UniProtKB/Swiss-Prot annotation:
It catalyses: a ubiquinone + NADH + 5 H(+)(in) = a ubiquinol + NAD(+) + 4 H(+)(out). This is NADH-ubiquinone oxidoreductase chain 4L. The keyword Transcription regulation does not apply. The chain crosses the membrane at residues 1-21, 29-49, 61-81. The lineage of its organism: Eukaryota, Metazoa, Chordata, Craniata, Vertebrata. It is a multi-pass membrane protein. One of its GO terms (biological process) is ATP synthesis coupled electron transport. InterPro entries: NADH_UbQ_OxRdtase_chain4L/K, NUOK/Mnh_C1-like. GO terms for cellular component: mitochondrial inner membrane; respiratory chain complex I. The keyword Electron transport applies. The gene is MT-ND4L. It comes from Phocoena phocoena. Its EC number is 7.1.1.2. It is found in: Mitochondrion inner membrane.
Length: 98
């Protein structure tokens, strides 16, 4: 395994640990999720380029589309929670149920 792959896996692991440690605030959780998706995107792109598998060239773009949707939904949730309660605690998400 090359040094680039190890660095990308370390970035994914650090984002996962950050998500587990700083899960009380929604903004921190969203940033950690974005870091995880970005490292997965880079790892997937490098793997596809190194394997010369031309049929899978669209997979990283599909992952970016899902990441953009996740970011938009996460920011909408963050705005709704912060406007309603004045804080961005994840525990306030349970109070948004009907």
């Amino acid at each position: 395994m090359s040094l680039i792959h190890i660095n990308i896996l370390m970035a994914f692991t650090m984002s996962l640990v950050g998500l587990l440690m700083y899960r009380s605030h929604l903004m921190s959780a969203l940033l950690c999720l974005e870091g995880m998706v970005l490292s997965l995107f880079i790892l997937m792109t490098l793997t596809i380029l190194n394997s010369h598998f031309t049929l899978a060239n669209m997979v990283p773009i599909i992952l970016l589309v899902f990441a953009a949707c996740e970011a938009a939904i996460g920011l909408a949730l963050l705005v709704m929670v912060s406007n309603t309660y004045g804080t961005d605690y994840v525990q306030n998400l349970n109070l948004l149920q009907c």
